[in-house]
Amino acid sequence: MEPAQPKFQWGQRVRAFVDLFNDGSFPEQPEGALLAKTGDAGEVVQVGMHVETNRPVYLVEFAPNRVVGCLEDEIAPL
């Protein structure tokens, strides 16, 4: 399977398309905590690739010290 091309770029302003909850990968918050609510604005600070699925993964800074890993269907351009 060929890697998907990223839809969003570093530095791009985006918004949360859905509520984003901690899946356990955000150590400063309890699992299940709301990290960003639908409509919250943020900036893509890194673009990576999920190795198993060849899908882009975006690190989005929604607030100072609140960088959340997101898939394309979880964010939208501003």
Residue ranges and their predicted role:
Residues E2-L78:
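Basic/aromatic-rich interaction segments and small domains that mediate binding to polyanionic partners
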